[in-house]
């Protein structure tokens, strides 16, 4: 039986003329872009204090009450004070940029000096970082207001982190729904409460869909920005590995890890991305971006961007769900109408498709074991310092771990994680990953492609209740991480564009063109508009 969420999100592009949510006669924070907000702030019809208050009212109404989306782990108690200070700056003629006074939420694996960083684990509750993550620092310098920190799949491990397990008992005991953590509990999808928000950035996805902030930050190791963006009907960008610094982000696997912006519009993603780029001495990977990053990606947002673009269709990732395929076919037809040169189909090498899951697991498990210890070594004495210590505490009955399934999953991770000196890990990192990247590049060259299109997920979003089955291994999202190339998702038809390294501007342009042509979006039915959502005017819209 198909889920309600699938019908709401995936079918909407084909039936967009049938229903349009009521809109306010004025500026509505659910639908306003950062450009809209800046115009209102500049005119004096809006203040950052009013904007922050409006978002806080939505959080108050919908996060722990009503539908109880449960996306927020920690709220910034000083958010209103910061907004007032930024309003004073604006009044005195100092505007830092387009994010001046704009609220953002952070996945709770980004370090912040003023709020704990838990990575979703109760073992890290109260853990305070000594400085902001690089990306957070850049946002704050640009005037963004960190409204709070949001839930995630614990330690950014989507699902139960038992990928690769073959023992049915381990799979069943260690299966955790995406968007659940021992620190934050279970986050719900605001479109359909029986479904999860996907992972691991499920809290960010749900919070942005529910309009708890203007934009948010997620992290992506194998699809963790794109999956939640798709499941929650928003826009997400997984940038090229090295475009954004990971300094101050709790690591999962630095060979793949990257931060990424998530928002309700392509424009907002583009604005946020440009603010956060730059070479960071604390993250050697960012050296790859020198001379390639931009400060303003909005210049690429033009209608007509898809005209003449060569877009390959990766049918290797279709055929898993008939309804999803119908939506992808409709998206392909739209691309053709917009003038794209569609290359259909393109074919990934079989060995890449067959080995990508195992390759991802070898690298991720080994690096998490080593890198979480490196991250925790400077934490206060009361916190665990190694993966083995995390496993011991999580599985100790005295701890009262609130996610016994995650305790099993962590134990499994520790049991299979290789050392970084293990020949199998070294071969995977230095040979197999290099081969994967070369194979993907060869695909772009063979078909002379500007981008590859595929369904972000081959199936609809999962129910919250785990079914005891292993996570699907046929998702294409981890290929973007294994190659290091950028991918962005969140179109109303849950598709992803996958591009060459440092082609973010081009991909955002494609997404913007598609977004403007289809205007296919839907607001979550469980978090409807509040009177305070409308700036200066009352809600007066009607369904056509």
Which positions does each model-derived feature cover?
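Short helix-loop capping/hinge segments that flank enzyme active sites or metal/cofactor-binding pockets
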Residues: 100-119, 300-312, 363-436, 441, ...
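Short glycine/serine-rich loop/turn segments
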Residues: 99-259, 284-287, 312-314, 452-469, ...
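Gly/Ser-rich, acidic/histidine-flanked active-site/gating loops
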Residues: 30, 110, 116, 256-258, ...
């Amino acid at each position: 039986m198909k889920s309600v969420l699938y019908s709401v999100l995936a079918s909407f592009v084909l039936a967009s003329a049938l229903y349009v949510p009521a809109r306010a006669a004025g500026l509505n924070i659910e639908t306003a872009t950062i450009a809209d907000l800046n115009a209102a702030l500049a005119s004096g019809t809006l203040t950052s204090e009013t904007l922050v208050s409006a978002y806080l009212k939505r959080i108050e109404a919908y996060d722990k009450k009503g539908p109880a989306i449960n996306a927020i782990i920690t709220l910034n108690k000083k958010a209103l004070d910061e907004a007032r200070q930024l309003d004073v700056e604006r009044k005195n003629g100092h505007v830092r940029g387009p994010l001046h006074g704009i609220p953002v939420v952070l996945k709770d694996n980004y370090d912040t000096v003023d709020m704990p960083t838990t990575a979703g684990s109760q073992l890290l509750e109260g853990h305070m970082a000594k400085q902001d993550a690089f990306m957070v620092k850049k946002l704050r310098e640009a005037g963004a207001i960190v409204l709070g920190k949001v839930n995630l799949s614990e330690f950014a491990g989507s699902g139960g982190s038992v990928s690769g397990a073959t023992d049915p008992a381990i799979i069943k005991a260690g299966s955790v729904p995406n968007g659940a953590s021992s620190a934050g509990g279970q986050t719900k999808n605001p479109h359909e409460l029986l479904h999860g928000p996907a992972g691991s950035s499920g809290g960010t996805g749900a919070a942005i869909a529910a309009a708890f902030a203007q934009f948010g930050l997620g992290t992506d190791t194998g699809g963790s920005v794109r999956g939640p963006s798709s499941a929650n009907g928003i826009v997400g960008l997984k940038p090229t590995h090295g475009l954004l610094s990971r300094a101050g982000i709790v690591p999962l696997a630095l060979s793949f890890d990257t931060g990424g912006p998530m928002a309700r519009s392509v424009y907002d993603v583009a604005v946020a991305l440009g603010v956060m780029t730059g070479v960071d001495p604390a993250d050697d990977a960012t050296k790859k971006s020198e001379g390639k990053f931009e400060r303003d990606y909005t210049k690429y947002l033009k209608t007509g961007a898809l005209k003449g673009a060569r877009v390959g269709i990766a049918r290797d990732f279709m055929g898993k769900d008939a309804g999803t395929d119908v939506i992808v076919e409709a998206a392909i037809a739209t691309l053709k109408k917009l003038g794209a040169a569609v290359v259909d189909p393109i074919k990934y090498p079989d060995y890449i498709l067959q080995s990508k899951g195992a390759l991802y697991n070898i690298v991720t498990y080994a690096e998490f074991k080593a890198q979480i210890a490196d991250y925790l070594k400077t934490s206060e004495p009361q916190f665990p310092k190694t993966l083995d210590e995390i496993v011991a505490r999580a599985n100790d009955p005295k701890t009262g771990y609130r996610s016994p399934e995650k305790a099993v999953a962590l134990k499994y991770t520790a049991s299979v994680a290789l050392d970084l000196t293990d020949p199998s890990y070294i071969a995977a990192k230095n040979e197999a990953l290099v081969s994967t990247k070369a194979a993907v590049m060869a695909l772009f060259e063979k078909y002379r492609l500007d981008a590859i299109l595929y369904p972000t997920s081959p199936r609809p979003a999962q129910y919250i209740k785990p079914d005891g089955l292993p996570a699907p291994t046929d998702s294409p999202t981890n290929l973007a991480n294994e190659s290091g190339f950028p991918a962005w998702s969140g179109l109303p038809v849950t598709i992803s564009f996958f591009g060459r390294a440092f082609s973010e501007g081009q991909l955002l342009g494609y997404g913007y063109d598609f977004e403007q042509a289809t205007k296919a979006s839907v607001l979550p039915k469980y978090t409807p508009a509040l009177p305070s959502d409308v700036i200066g005017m009352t809600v007066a819209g009607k369904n056509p």
